[in-house]
Amino acid sequence: MREIVHLQTGQCGNQIGAAFWQTISGEHGLDGSGVYNGTSDLQLERMNVYFNEASNNKFVPRAVLVDLEPGTMDAVRAGPFGQLFRPDNFVFGQSGAGNNWAKGHYTEGAELVDQVLDVVRREAEGCDCLQGFQITHSLGGGTGAGMGTLLISKIREEFPDRMMATYSVVPSPKVSDTVVEPYNATLSIHQLVENSDETFCIDNEALYDICMRTLKLNNPSYGDLNHLVSAVMSGVTTCLRFPGQLNSDLRKLAVNMVPFPRLHFFMVGFAPLTSRGAHSFRAVTVPELTQQMFDPKNMMAASDFRNGRYLTCSAYFRGKVSMKEVEDQMRNVQNKNSSYFVEWIPNNVQTALCSIPPRGLKMSSTFVGNSTSIQELFKRVGDQFTAMFRRKAFLHWYTGEGMDEMEFTEAESNMNDLVSEYQQYQEASVSEGEEEYDEEAPLEAEE
């Protein structure tokens, strides 16, 4: 079967990862110690994508947990699903990276990386037919960003033909955890552009907004945010974990979603999002799901797709949904909003169906979009980076670990290139001869 090996690095990565395993264990009928209590054969059929069956009917996640300090690991171990993971798969250092990308990528992280790769190799050897890797991390810190990208490039070297998907928490515009976030993020994106096949961008602020605006939570905790992320991760991987009519795997997703190799940064969304109290008062319909899914307020990254155009997007519907209704709704969305889709990729919306809904819902949908408006996010980080780098603020922390200023300049220009590539495809039209301007685009849609 097509297995996926999961890595989680750094504090953020481990917390999101833990939430993800909790969600999918529930969907597959596993309790906190990995014993199967489910009712449906469908839960077992493709269990081995993410789980390894050990002796005495215990299922063990194919997960590698990495951090440069023991704190977060202990928290995961003490959590409700701490007994699920294989004890040898916890790899941690003692020093911490202190939010310093260079420590994670070049010094502390580099010392630990071989240990991690041994565990990854062992997990990969336990697979019949390894499909690829997924990694959860944040781009603003030291371990997840620095060491996470180091792991990605090492795994790339060793498994060049396997898919690499990353769930990356990008720095948010207003909520900043650390001052050097723009440095860490720019250096990380520099790596991801080259080494990842698909990157799902998630951002804390957008998650906060969803919690406050849609879920009506007054002061959302990180637990609530991680719960949202795990819902999306569960949705994106649905087709791999359950038999569906329209199946999709990491490679198919990439083939359908990435028109140009560098442009593989996706926005994700999830529907239905309703406040906890309102669940029982409304039935969810396919049109509602579709509408909510394409709503900018539902996107988990702070960029508004109305400022750009979709190159491609894909929607995963779960539950008892009629194929025809889904097709009609998706066509409807494309016709009504044709100005938001590039016209030089004719069938750029792809749908996949799976008959098993998430726990507690009749149906749900997950949205993955490759929109040129994601450049807002990179622009924002780039501007902050430039402001600090021009004054060489905080640079000594990085050069002290052996980094060169040249690397910063390279990362900066790579990110600027990425932004202008997105912009170029946003403005491109079918007939390249006549320049088409954005001001005219909305009018065409209304005629």
UniProtKB/Swiss-Prot annotation:
Cellular compartments annotated: Cytoplasm, Cytoskeleton
Residue spans crossing the bilayer: none
Region (Disordered): 424-447
Biased composition (Acidic residues): 432-447
Annotated keywords: Cytoplasm, Cytoskeleton, GTP-binding, Magnesium, Metal-binding, Microtubule, Nucleotide-binding
Organism superkingdom: Eukaryota
Function: Tubulin is the major constituent of microtubules, a cylinder consisting of laterally associated linear protofilaments composed of alpha- and beta-tubulin heterodimers. Microtubules grow by the addition of GTP-tubulin dimers to the microtubule end, where a stabilizing cap forms. Below the cap, tubulin dimers are in GDP-bound state, owing to GTPase activity of alpha-tubulin.
Similarity section: Belongs to the tubulin family.
Descriptive protein name: Tubulin beta chain
Source organism: Cochliobolus heterostrophus (Southern corn leaf blight fungus)
